Regions:
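Conserved catalytic cores of very large enzyme subunits
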Residues: 1-170
Length: 170
């Protein structure tokens, strides 16, 4: 099913069938999952947080399947972000952080967002949103979370290389 999802979101249907929809997927360490889903229940009444290990394992499988698909096909989406809580000079969920960093070292396919509080989220655009004040939430998952490139500085290495005529100057 993960493969179907990846292929489906990469199908061109926006702008005259030439572009696929922009899609973000966030992956969370234990403290983020606890903050986001701590009091939430499944339809059968069980608490989501009781399945935190299974949720983390599913996220890892999702990331590995996505990376495997991308190793064989050029897939633009989803844009992936891993959110990790970093306090007092260390990751609070060290096992998950080690996995996330090792995964990204191998595949280089994710943005890694480290923060000292689980009250903020980030997605592909590196824009930090406060989850304590979502503003609104609707039945299809829409919220007032910010997306965009506010206060984002991007170093355009390709442009720097273009403007320098030899490797020494670059």
């Amino acid at each position: 099913q993960i493969q179907r999802f990846i292929y489906a979101i990469n199908q061109p249907y926006v702008r005259d069938g030439m572009q696929s929809a922009f899609t973000n997927v966030s992956v969370f360490d234990g403290p983020y999952l606890e903050a986001l889903f701590g009091g939430s229940t499944f339809p059968d009444g069980t608490f989501m947080i009781d399945y935190i290990d299974e949720i983390k394992e599913f996220q890892k499988i999702f990331m590995e399947v996505t990376a495997d698909i991308r190793s064989k096909n050029m897939m633009t989406f989803p844009v992936l972000t891993m959110s990790l809580l970093y306090q007092n000079g260390k990751f609070t969920d060290e096992e998950f952080a080690r996995w996330a960093i090792e995964h990204n070292r191998k595949w280089n396919d994710s943005n890694i967002f480290c923060d000292s509080s689980v009250n903020s989220l980030s997605n592909c655009c590196r824009l930090k949103s406060n989850i304590e004040d979502l503003g609104y939430f609707n039945s299809i998952g829409g919220t007032a979370l910010k997306v965009g490139s506010v206060k984002v500085s991007t170093i355009n290495l390709a442009r720097i290389a273009l403007e320098h005529y030899n490797e020494k100057d670059y």
